[in-house]
Amino acid sequence: MILKRLILMIAFIGAVILGASISHAAYIAPPSTVGEAVVLIDADTKEILFAKNPDKWMHPASTTKMVTLLTALELKGTQLDELATISSYATSMEESNLGVRVGDQITLEGVLEGMMVASGNDAAVVVAENVSGSVEKFAKDMNRVASKAGAKNSVFLNPHGLTQMGHHSTARDLAMIAAYGMKYQMFRDKVANDYYKVPYQNRTPETIRTTNHFIRNKYPGANGLKTGFTNAAGECLIASATRNGHTMIVVMLNDDNRWDEAVQFLDYGFKLRGVI
């Protein structure tokens, strides 16, 4: 009897030690971040895998253009081959710009592609005016589409993300919007371009390269999304990658180490899901 109890006790202690060892081995520490607000989301399940200040109101800078793209696709997805009208107001935007001119002949799709690759503020205004009639009306459409995508704490007042009082979003909201958009092939196609030849019909097409070094650096599986910077917002990045059919998205707002951290957080997310 004593021997049996001793054997059972040893077996129990061994099981406890083994369980603790397995639990410890399974834990994967998240990366550190200097970002003010960061969210890592599993785009397939919408599960938040890491969050730092996820609901803090932040200046989104040009990550706003992701919402502009999604709104245009939702409202005009079947009419992108129409020629866009270029207003003098659009051409007066502060940099960065695509470089459209009044009188240019270019389709709405061409403007959208150029907006995402060059992060063109002028192109964003062209999109807004041609989709909804004005920047103000388009902003209302942006907020409606963002809400549909799962945003709860965002207010978009312009299509480009230049600093404007009251224009704000959160890392969580931007992650939800990005995950929503990545379900659609047309959206995925337009957030993943490294180069783009702007198809002007009245002048020589111009080849431009993305401002997104995450895409340019060829991270394995990289497929988007958008950069951003203003003095008020700091350096921002929404980065997405897909491996073995599994998509991870990280949102980093006011993060001076955004390029390195994008790689670290996406690697972390894939490791958590057992994806190599």
What are these regions (language model features)?
Residues 5-6, 66, 247:
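Hydrophobic alpha-helical segments, especially transmembrane helices
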Residues 24-172, 176-185, 243:
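Active-site-adjacent loops and short helices of periplasmic peptidoglycan-processing enzymes
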Residues 4, 8, 31, 35, ...:
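Hydrophobic alpha-helical segments and their boundary regions
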Residues 151-155, 163-276:
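Domain-terminus/edge residues, biased toward the C-terminal soluble/receptor-binding domains
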Residues 1-2, 62, 223, 258:
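Short alpha-helical segments used as structural interaction elements across diverse proteins
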Residues 1-37, 41-49, 79, 267, ...:
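N-terminal secretory targeting signals
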